[in-house]
C-alpha cells in the first residue's frame, strides 16, 4: 500500500477512535460517575475511569497518562493507595478506598483558556524515530499545541480531543475542558525511593516509613538491566541535554561516536534527569507517556515527564534509591 494510503488509513482510524471515545464523555458524565466494576474498563475509556484516575493523580498515586482506562497502571496506583491508607488492597475500587479518595471534593474537570505561550512553539513537524536523527535539532519540543496541553494536564491527546469537540488547540483565548489534577504540588519530602524492577513501580517513603507517593515506570530489560541494591541521588537536572555514549550499545543506534540531543519534552529523557550513583543510570522523563510501564527501558527508570518532575521535587542529593525485585502475588499475575 502506498505511503499516502497508509497515512490516510491511520488518520481515519484515529478519527473513528476519537469519535467513539467522545460518545458519552463530558464534564457532567465524569463528575457523576461512580467507579463500579461495570463502569470501568481496561479496553476503553469511560467517565468513571477518568474520575478515578484524576483522584489518584491528585493524591500523588499516579495512574500515568490519564486516558479513562482502568488498565494496569491505574490498578497498580489503586493498590498502592490502599496500601498507604492501610486499607485492604484490591483490583476493584472498594467503598473504603473510594470514600478516602473523595476527601478531595473538587470537580474532576475544569476549564482553561489557551495562552499565547501555549501556542508559541516552536513545534516539531515530526519527532524522528532514530536517536541519531535528533542530534541536529536545536530543541526537542512538542509536535503540536495539543500535545503540549495534554501533557500539561497529565492527559492523553485522545481524551483531550474527546472533551473538546470542535475546539482549536492552536488558538490563544480558546477555552477548553481539561481534567483538574490540582496545582502540581509535590508529595512531602521523601526519605527513601523504592524501585520495584518486577512490578515496574516507583514508591516514595517518608521518615516514618509511610508511603507518600507512587508512580508507574519502565524499568530496565534483560538486555540492559537496571542496577541492584541501594544507590543515591547525586544530581537533579531539569531540562537535560541527552548525551549518547557508544559504549551503551543501544539497539537501533548505530553511531560509533558520542553525540548529544538538545533539551525538550521530546528529548529521549524528557524534561527531567535525576542522576544516580551508578555511571549512566538515572530516573527520567519520556517523550512517550502512553508507553510507561508497558515496555522496558535501556536500564534507567523512565516516568512520564510530570511524574519525573514530581519525584525530583520530593528528593534531594543523597536520597537513597533502593532497587528491589518484588514478586507478583499469584492473583495479580
Predicted feature locations:
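Primarily a LysM-type cell-wall glycan-binding module
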Residues: 42-76, 118-154
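Secretory/export targeting leaders with adjacent low-complexity proregions
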Residues: 135-216
Amino acid at each position: 500500500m502506498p505511503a499516502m494510503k497508509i497515512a490516510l488509513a491511520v488518520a481515519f482510524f484515529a478519527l473513528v477512535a476519537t469519535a467513539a471515545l467522545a460518545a458519552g464523555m463530558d464534564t457532567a458524565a465524569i463528575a457523576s460517575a461512580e467507579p463500579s466494576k461495570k463502569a470501568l474498563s481496561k479496553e476503553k475509556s469511560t467517565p468513571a475511569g477518568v474520575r478515578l484516575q484524576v483522584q489518584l493523580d491528585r493524591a500523588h498515586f499516579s495512574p500515568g497518562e490519564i486516558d479513562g482506562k482502568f488498565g494496569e497502571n491505574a490498578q497498580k496506583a489503586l493498590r498502592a493507595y490502599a496500601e498507604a491508607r492501610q486499607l485492604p488492597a484490591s483490583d476493584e475500587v472498594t467503598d473504603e478506598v473510594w470514600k478516602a479518595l473523595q476527601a478531595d471534593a473538587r470537580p474532576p474537570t475544569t476549564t482553561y483558556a489557551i495562552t499565547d505561550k501555549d501556542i508559541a512553539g516552536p513545534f516539531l513537524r515530526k519527532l524522528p524515530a532514530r536517536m541519531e536523527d535528533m542530534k541536529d535539532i536545536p530543541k526537542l519540543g512538542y509536535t503540536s499545541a495539543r500535545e503540549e496541553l495534554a501533557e500539561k494536564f497529565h492527559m492523553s491527546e485522545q481524551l483531550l480531543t474527546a472533551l473538546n469537540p470542535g475546539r482549536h488547540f492552536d488558538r490563544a483565548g480558546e477555552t477548553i475542558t481539561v481534567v483538574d489534577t490540582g496545582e502540581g504540588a509535590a508529595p512531602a519530602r521523601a526519605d527513601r525511593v523504592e524501585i520495584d524492577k518486577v512490578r515496574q513501580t516507583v514508591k516514595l517513603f517518608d521518615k516514618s516509613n509511610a508511603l507518600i507517593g507512587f508512580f508507574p515506570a519502565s524499568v530496565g530489560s534483560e538486555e540492559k538491566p537496571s542496577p541492584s541494591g541501594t544507590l543515591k541521588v547525586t544530581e537533579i537536572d531539569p531540562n537535560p541535554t541527552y548525551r549518547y555514549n557508544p559504549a551503551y550499545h543501544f539497539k537501533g543506534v548505530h553511531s560509533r561516536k558520542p553525540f548529544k540531543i538538545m533539551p525538550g519534552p521530546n528529548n529521549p529523557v524528557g524534561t527531567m534527569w535525576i542522576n544516580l550513583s551508578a555511571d549512566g543510570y538515572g530516573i527520567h522523563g519520556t517523550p512517550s507517556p502512553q508507553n510507561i510501564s508497558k515496555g522496558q527501558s535501556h536500564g534507567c527508570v523512565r516516568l512520564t515527564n510530570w511524574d519525573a518532575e514530581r519525584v525530583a521535587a520530593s528528593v534531594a542529593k543523597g536520597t537513597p534509591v533502593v532497587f528491589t525485585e518484588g514478586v507478583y502475588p499469584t492473583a495479580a499475575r
